[in-house]
């Protein structure tokens, strides 16, 4: 074989080996891609949820050569593993005073940041923690659309939630449902949220569960179908919700609707001696749910609805104590009334409020002013639910009477690792119109406190924004 033939032979052999190597590489790449997509498209029903990833990185430097080794461990959990319905078996914790839990300072921050205009706020917890909720007005404090947000009902309102302690903004708020009245609660497996929307004479409710709309409820009295404006409570999957449709200053039609996974299980007309029900603040303990409400028609004493979620039944009455907790209200009388409203007070027909009724361990919240939504205090009133002579044995200032308050309501972190359910409450700190007409908007910040067995001091947790900075 001459030299030219040798060169041609060697070249041909090299080219053949190169082509074979290229084909092997292509086949290997195709096999890897195919296996990747085969795993990635395995049906969800056969694939456990990947709930988290732990990774650790080790760096070793030898003779100026750096090697990085990363170990990745996937934490695998089957769907609904360790997820069960909340069971309200524990009692309330003993409370001797209240410690601060959260304060969002939304109005102060909103002076130079994009903060949502809200009202009717509350807190609600789930197995992962607690979130703040409110009805947004679809605009920010600095936006021109903030003009006119003193009005309660519009097509632009939505129930939003955000991480506890932050101020609500367009960037951190999650829309739960659309509407101008709401409630929301977690049953241990998923969250149910309810929003009312529509015109006054034909409003409707949409019930969401697990992030999807499940049930729709039409108006039954044609007069502002509305609900609690704070969290509902669930027991063994049953979540009762109090709804009212009808006049705010006369007899209205109230119903207790029992839901499971967003679907109606039973509807009850209001029974008992309560004459008017709005904006109930509910909590659960010892397999009973108690709702402390607002009588916007007659009573300066608050109506109480006691619900048995196992039997899906209820009764209603009035808070027996002579300590009146609605606003406006007359002076505290010498005797309370368990079965009828106590009338009197100024022109303001009422405000949302709360109480925890637990025998000797009972606490009531109210504005300090009898006539307006200013200041806020909580009073320990043993046996307030049953004793017409019961009076306060201690109290704690939450907001001093030189500052505005607003709605208040109950909530509990039912998943906290305690031997009892620790009572918590929030106070809405309203700013802007109508009391502060130099700005165009009406909005709020939130302060929240929880019970303590210790005897802690009082402080004023007022909003703290300088309205003059907004001019």
From Swiss-Prot:
GO terms for molecular function: exo-alpha-sialidase activity; metal ion binding. Ca(2+) binds at residues 295, 299, 326. The chain crosses the membrane at residues 7-27. Pfam families: Neur. It catalyses: Hydrolysis of alpha-(2->3)-, alpha-(2->6)-, alpha-(2->8)- glycosidic linkages of terminal sialic acid residues in oligosaccharides, glycoproteins, glycolipids, colominic acid and synthetic substrates. Residues 36-89 are annotated as: Hypervariable stalk region. InterPro entries: Glyco_hydro_34, Sialidase_sf. Residues 1-6 are intravirion. Inhibited by the neuraminidase inhibitors zanamivir (Relenza) and oseltamivir (Tamiflu). These drugs interfere with the release of progeny virus from infected cells and are effective against all influenza strains. Resistance to neuraminidase inhibitors is quite rare. One of its GO terms (cellular component) is membrane. Substrate binds at residues 119, 153, 278-279, 294, 373. It comes from the Viruses. Keywords: Calcium, Disulfide bond, Glycoprotein, Glycosidase, Host cell membrane, Host membrane, Hydrolase, Membrane, Metal-binding, Signal-anchor, Transmembrane, Transmembrane helix, Virion. It is found in: Virion membrane; Host apical cell membrane. One of its GO terms (biological process) is carbohydrate metabolic process. Disulfide bonds join 93-420, 125-130, 185-232, 234-239, 280-293, 282-291, 320-338, 424-450. Intact N-terminus is essential for virion morphogenesis. Possesses two apical sorting signals, one in the ectodomain, which is likely to be a glycan, and the other in the transmembrane domain. The transmembrane domain also plays a role in lipid raft association. Homotetramer. The influenza A genome consist of 8 RNA segments. Genetic variation of hemagglutinin and/or neuraminidase genes results in the emergence of new influenza strains. The mechanism of variation can be the result of point mutations or the result of genetic reassortment between segments of two different strains. Catalyzes the removal of terminal sialic acid residues from viral and cellular glycoconjugates. Cleaves off the terminal sialic acids on the glycosylated HA during virus budding to facilitate virus release. Additionally helps virus spread through the circulation by further removing sialic acids from the cell surface. These cleavages prevent self-aggregation and ensure the efficient spread of the progeny virus from cell to cell. Otherwise, infection would be limited to one round of replication. This is Neuraminidase.
